[in-house]
Amino acid sequence: MIEESSNASAGPVVLRDAVPADAPGIASIYNDAVRHSTAIWNDVEVDAGNRAEWIAARRRDGFPVLVAVDGDGAVLAYGSFGPWRNFDGYRHTVEHSVYVRGDCRGMGLGRRMLAALVDAARVQGRHVMVAAIDASNTPSIALHRQLGFEESGLVREAGFKFGRWLDLLFMRLQLDERGVDERSVQASAARALH
């Protein structure tokens, strides 16, 4: 996947598959979110080696990791999706994450990244994409609504960061209109009996 656009402040911005050399830039964006936001509900920062392993694991499991880079190759944003839950019944559902470097927010990179991930999930034949968002993150909620996501649940006080409880909003986007055929129902029932 390679998609290019131009931005006056950053020059040409390319959306492409991440490579190991992008790991330091991804780690920097991740760590900024750990330190300064509730976009990530982790307290521990990571290094480039951790992110390189993460990229490799996502790829090994068949999931994309995308980056938006400027003309110098600096990582401006990244995104991925992976399993929503690790049970067979959820195999058609994925959960995504998108993070944009602080000085690059408001340039449309989050929208481009999320749209590219939605496209990739459709190509993979996924059925639903889930977003798990801090319920006070109104810009992220608005972006997801603009791309067709709908609110599907709220878990109050599900997380804790910066000395306060955080509410978790789930949003979902149905990626296709497939129904359920009788053979699938019978096969699932047969597996459940064994």
Please identify what each model-predicted range represents.
Residues 105, 131-141:
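Conserved beta-strand-loop-alpha-helix junction that forms the acyl-donor binding cleft
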